[in-house]
Amino acid sequence: MNSLKIPDFLIFSTISSVFHSKENLMNTTAKFHLTAAAFGVLIASSVYAETNQVYSNTVQAHNAPMTVIMKDGKIANILTDNRESPGVGKLAIANLSKKIIRNQTINVDNVTGASVTSMALKYAVKKNLEAAGADLSKFQTKLPKAQLKDTYSSEVVIVGGGGAGLAAAASVIEAGGTAIIVEKLGYLGGSTVVSGGGYNAVDPERQNRQNIDDSIDRHFQDTMRGGHNKNNPELVKKLVEEAPPTMHWLEGKGLGFGPKVRVIVGGLYPRGHGAEGGGYGYIRVLEKFIKAYPDKVKVFTDTQAVKLIKNEAGKVIGVLGKHDSKDVNFMASKGVIIATGCYGSNEEMRKAFAPYSLHADAQIYFPTKSNTGDAHIMAMQAGGVMQKNDNHAATVHLEAGAGSYGFLHVNANGERFMNEDVNTQSKSCSKELQPHGIAWTVYDSNWTQDVKKQVDGNLAGGLFYGQMWQPWGNGWNVEIEKASQAQHIKDGKVVVADTL
């Protein structure tokens, strides 16, 4: 089957706004703006009624302006023009809105993995009902749980509904088989859906247009060097050889890649391709393909895989899942594919297998509820063993603080301690060894022009630079970077020389 490797990447920004309405009580149109925050709580300010009503509430959730329309005392529609994470918050809002309208109740379960957005939506609808003078008790009907059978069977059972799991399911379809996807979150996409969507592959057609000389062997050597030659050469060889055809396979499914090639975040050489729609682009095209074959693939969300089922001979023949506290057997006649994420949110496993990762100051990538190492644990319980390395590879970088750029790095004693053009991992690990685990980047008033040269010229050894939210194919925005730096100065992450 084809392989799919997608780096996980997303940083959320914060947007503040309020709710407002200008209609009468029983035919109310209230527009709500859900405020972005890393950790969400619901905060309501004063609500008051006048002839031309205005309701002011603040909800900390994710970016989602929405309009709730009341008609004849009922919820008629919930309109959204939101800036939610594609495939996560947007999907949560769409699914919950349909349930609320269809059943005329706000007593619906949150979408697993999008709890903050789910709570914010229900809170917004509740405030609108109150504003309309509705009897809230009439909108509290508890919906019955969907009942699953004890056993489901297919040729292949896939644990995990992220990018890898959906790619596996699409490959099963193309091979003429049937599959079941078991996903513990309330939506498909996993970490891939909130990733930056960058894809490393040798692609002469695009690279030649930018006079970039590249080869499969060079990609192999760069990847080995990035892993300090601790990588498994056979796996790296397969990765770099399969990357181009898999990229074209995705294009055949409808995924577009921008024409400009650049150094991917943390990379060493300009062979990074940006997927249209970022990480959600992968999920969108793969999910669309799979949905076209409902007789081939069945998807079970909100279903936790808890154990691999083995026969008397010790062969894995299925997966024991749990859905709403009910045990469900998913049997596979031809095999089980484990396609889950990492264990970055499992502190016990990180202590055991990647203790260096515990030194990081922040975790900014994957949804914290998804990457908890469940499948790793299942596999070990079934007799599998973890890779025997001194430390499992963790993506650790400098950007929990201010942007590091490609400038002179010194420690707290003012001493230069490394070659600044090494890869991102080496920079980060070197910084951790310095006094207090802190490094400073030194640059002058021409820094914006210099950073632009780094970005445009694919320089700086794979440093994080430019805007993390910068769409692939768009230029580096000086004004955004200046605004970001102004905030860093306020936060004390950047110090201006003449203020010392």
Q: Which sequence ranges carry the predicted segments?
A:
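An anion/pyrophosphate-binding glycine-rich loop and adjacent beta-alpha core
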Residues: 376, 385-500
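Conserved N-terminal/central alpha/beta ligand/cofactor-binding core
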Residues: 107, 111, 178, 187, ...
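Conserved beta-strand-loop-beta-strand element in the redox core of flavoprotein oxidoreductases
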Residues: 309-330
